[in-house]
Amino acid sequence: MFHGYRGSAERDLCGGVQRCFALGRSALLVDQRCAGKSGGHVITFGIRESLDCVDWANFMAKEFPDRKFILCGISMGGSTVLMAGTHPLPSQVVGILDDCGFSSPKAIIQKVIADMHLPPKLAYPFVRLGAILFGGFDPDSGSAIEAVKQCKLPVFFTHGEDDDFVPCSMSRENFQACASRKILHTVPGAGHGLAYPANQEEYLKALGDFFREDLK
């Protein structure tokens, strides 16, 4: 399970653990780069984190060769696991759960710029240049919405309809673009990252029904 921007596994993934236990599953909680107990100095909005996700998937497949896994992420972690889906993954990975991930680094950065009452189209090129010069990565080099066009794994998209940080419309865009088996589960009244707490019973039923055959 992969947490969001400037989060940590310990703080942000407690609800995810509860979901897993409710479905009779185990969970691996990952501190993403530049967070928690992990190293690193730059957050790349899921671009390099998606490669870390692939490494974790390979590690788990080696340690537990008889288990099946679902890549789960919330917020930036959701975009991370979606982007990881374009890379070669072990056969034990049977699905992806994206909880309120954004459609692309560029889209979420522009949205935050707009929230600051600045012109996104004018300001974004400077943010991008700063990321390239000082962060060593290009925000335009990765995109969840482009990744899901190549996805072959089943994807469970979920989002709170009242999310004012990552708009629910971004999950709708990702869902529409996704080429594999998919479902979009939205929760009225739920804010950012709160789709599960807002209606746990309905969430678990939808999740369990969708992945039932994959996890057999």
Report each predicted region and the residues it spans.
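The serine-hydrolase catalytic nucleophile loop
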Residues: Y5-R19, Q32
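Alpha/beta-hydrolase active-site loop
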Residues: I43-F64
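Alpha/beta-hydrolase fold nucleophile elbow
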Residues: F64-S75
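Hydrolase active-site cap/lid region
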Residues: M83-D138, E146
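Short alpha-helix in the alpha/beta-hydrolase fold that links the catalytic acid
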Residues: A144, L153, P167-Q176
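Short beta-strand/loop motif that positions the catalytic acidic residue
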Residues: Q150-K152, F157-H159, D163
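Acidic catalytic loop of the alpha/beta-hydrolase fold
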Residues: E161-V166, G193-L194
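Catalytic histidine-centered segment of alpha/beta-hydrolase-like enzymes
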Residues: A190-L204
